[in-house]
From Swiss-Prot:
Residues 111-143, 334-440 are annotated as: Disordered. It comes from Rattus norvegicus. It holds the Pfam family Connexin. Belongs to the connexin family. Alpha-type (group II) subfamily. InterPro entries: Connexin (IPR000500), Connexin50 (IPR002266), Connexin_CCC (IPR019570), Connexin_CS (IPR017990), Connexin_N (IPR013092), Connexin_N_sf (IPR038359). The gene is Gja8. Residues 43-71, 183-210 are extracellular. This is Gap junction alpha-8 protein.
Amino acid sequence: MGDWSFLGNILEEVNEHSTVIGRVWLTVLFIFRILILGTAAEFVWGDEQSDFVCNTQQPGCENVCYDEAFPISHIRLWVLQIIFVSTPSLMYVGHAVHHVRMEEKRKDREAEELCQQSRSNGGERVPIAPDQASIRKSSSSSKGTKKFRLEGTLLRTYVCHIIFKTLFEVGFIVGHYFLYGFRILPLYRCSRWPCPNVVDCFVSRPTEKTIFILFMLSVAFVSLFLNIMEMSHLGMKGIRSAFKRPAEQPLGEIAEKSLHSIAVSSIQKAKGYQLLEEEKIVSHYFPLTEVGMVETSPLSAKPFSQFEEKIGTGPLADMSRGYQETLPSYAQVGAQEVEREEQPVEEAVEPEVGEKKQEAEKVAPEGQETVAVPDGEKVETPGVGKDDEKEELQAEKVTKQGLSAEKAPTLCPELTTDDNRPLSRLSKASSRARSDDLTI
């Protein structure tokens, strides 16, 4: 049958570039087809034409009947089947080898570029990226174990070669059925020219040949089943990868873009950052001012959250306008109130002074001369004495206490209390001196 070593060496290369099911298919091809076909089938079909005997003496009738019974030898048919079924695998191996060589050239080119970069940097070590490190590892592993992944055009070529193998298997099984059927009969009747009549021909080893035919057909069906299984395996794998990509790609993007997003977000916050509604700060609302808040109850009685806002909850830019205004201090408010209250007090004091002057003139006894006293000074008579002084001092105290009570802020209740302390000696002496000056 010839030497199968050449085809075997090529198919070994296919084993290195196939899936698990593809390797099983190659095992079936080598052991159950090539090995059995090269060892046992030749001995069974070795005497095929010589042992084909017909009951006629007509020259050429036996050869014509054999050609009609066996248009092609089973062994040659199976050899053609092996060749045709292996051809797509050979095409795939050629493409895989080309792909591997191109990858090796690309990796060598990248390694040269890295060397040139390191030389251009003055001998400094350039930090190796993870992709480049993986490329180096994969290149070393590909040289050692020749492992790779089915992706891209290589995967398409692999799927196409499985489809063609399946088609060839089905075609040869159907052709075998139409040519021979699934069994060999011991008696074959032939009526072909130049036979004078119907001739009976006898086949040697019909049972053994039938067993071999059934065995080879079963191996063909097993190979067909493995092809279908491999197609379904690749299909399920593609579906799983398609379902996993939407879940895995966002994670990969987040992992790659996390550092970039952090840097960009920090720059944007530095330029301008607006607080969200839930991030509003309310600790700067003061209950004593009437700009932003109005106190509904004492500060110690209720928490700060119970203050009601006068201004609607709008953007913080509107709220900040109220706090930019300058608020009047306690001193300014007190000064304004004093200015308002001084005018009616002065008007009330002037008529009181005039009445006191008239009373002093009436009370003065006859024979004494009245002296004109300038405004603002007290007039005392010798007849009145110390009682009038006490009454005037008490009136002055009352007026002073009223003014102080009106001018003092409401927040200090201690200042509004009456002062019942006695007058000092100096104040009494000054009042006596004034009364002595007024008397004549």
